[in-house]
């Protein structure tokens, strides 16, 4: 049996190659930053303890007046968002240009060249034509419900809401995140509002799992894809 002994330099090169391969494999999945950066929930401030008045009704315990509806208006209140997004977009463009040119002139000859090039002339013709068309269309539909929490109350009374829903299905973890600004006047009696009535709405649907990792190209692969000439 023939034995092969690696020189120190060859050993170092082999170790570097293994390290680069492991680094490239580890970079196959690049985490994506969520579009919603604000907190997903909020808790109301702890109310100050009040001395019991001795009656049946305790305003400090109830948290809201007796004859007030249950619509959210304070930090920590919850609200149901009815997601009903349907967006269609179509775009088309075209361009057409045509340019032609023709040049014809005689070349004067003198002396002994007259016999050879007596009828010599030059002509040039050019034609440039360009035609292009393009089109794109997109259709997105997103329906569902998510319950969010009031994280802030603006000075004008509008509510800043955000929330997250996580679902573990088989071996994949799916996320639904929502944030926006809600006008309390648009909230129905069922304590819900449509997403189309929410200002600055940010809706995110993503997943984590082996299927999502298989569909994501690593940054090192994207680098070689951009510089490859084929």
From Swiss-Prot:
It is a lipid-anchor. Keywords: Bacterial flagellum, Cell outer membrane, Lipoprotein, Membrane, Palmitate, Signal. One of its GO terms (molecular function) is cytoskeletal motor activity. The keyword Transmembrane does not apply. A lipid is attached at residue 27 (N-palmitoyl cysteine). InterPro entries: Flag_Lring. A lipid is attached at residue 27 (S-diacylglycerol cysteine). The keyword Cytoplasm does not apply. Its main location: membrane. It comes from the Bacteria. One of its GO terms (biological process) is bacterial-type flagellum-dependent cell motility. One of its GO terms (cellular component) is bacterial-type flagellum basal body, distal rod, L ring. It is found in: Cell outer membrane; Bacterial flagellum basal body. Residues 1-26 form the signal peptide. NCBIfam families: PRK12697.1. Belongs to the FlgH family. PANTHER family: FLAGELLAR L-RING PROTEIN. Assembles around the rod to form the L-ring and probably protects the motor/basal body from shearing forces during rotation. The basal body constitutes a major portion of the flagellar organelle and consists of four rings (L,P,S, and M) mounted on a central rod. This is Flagellar L-ring protein. It comes from Burkholderia lata (strain ATCC 17760 / DSM 23089 / LMG 22485 / NCIMB 9086 / R18194 / 383).
């Amino acid at each position: 049996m023939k034995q092969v002994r690696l020189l120190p330099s060859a050993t170092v090169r082999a170790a570097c190659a293994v390290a680069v391969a492991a680094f490239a494999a580890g970079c196959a999945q690049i985490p994506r930053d969520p579009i919603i950066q604000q907190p997903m929930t909020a808790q109301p401030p702890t109310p100050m303890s009040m001395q019991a008045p001795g009656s049946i009704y305790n305003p400090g315990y109830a948290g809201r007046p007796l004859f007030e509806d249950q619509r959210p208006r304070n930090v920590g209140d919850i609200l149901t968002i009815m997601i009903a997004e349907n967006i269609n977009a179509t775009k088309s463009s075209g361009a057409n240009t045509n340019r032609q040119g023709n040049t014809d002139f005689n070349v004067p000859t003198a002396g002994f060249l007259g016999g050879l090039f007596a009828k010599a002339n030059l002509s040039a013709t050019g034609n440039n034509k360009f035609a292009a068309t393009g089109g794109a269309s997109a259709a997105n539909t997103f329906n569902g419900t998510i319950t969010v929490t009031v994280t802030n109350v603006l000075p004008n009374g509008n509510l800043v809401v955000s929330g997250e829903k996580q679902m573990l299905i088989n071996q994949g973890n799916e996320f639904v995140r929502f944030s926006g600004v809600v006008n309390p006047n648009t909230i129905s009696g069922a304590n819900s509002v449509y997403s189309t009535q929410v200002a600055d709405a940010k809706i995110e649907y993503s997943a984590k799992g082996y299927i999502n990792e298989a569909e994501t190209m690593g940054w090192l692969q994207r680098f070689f894809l951009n510089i490859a000439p084929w």
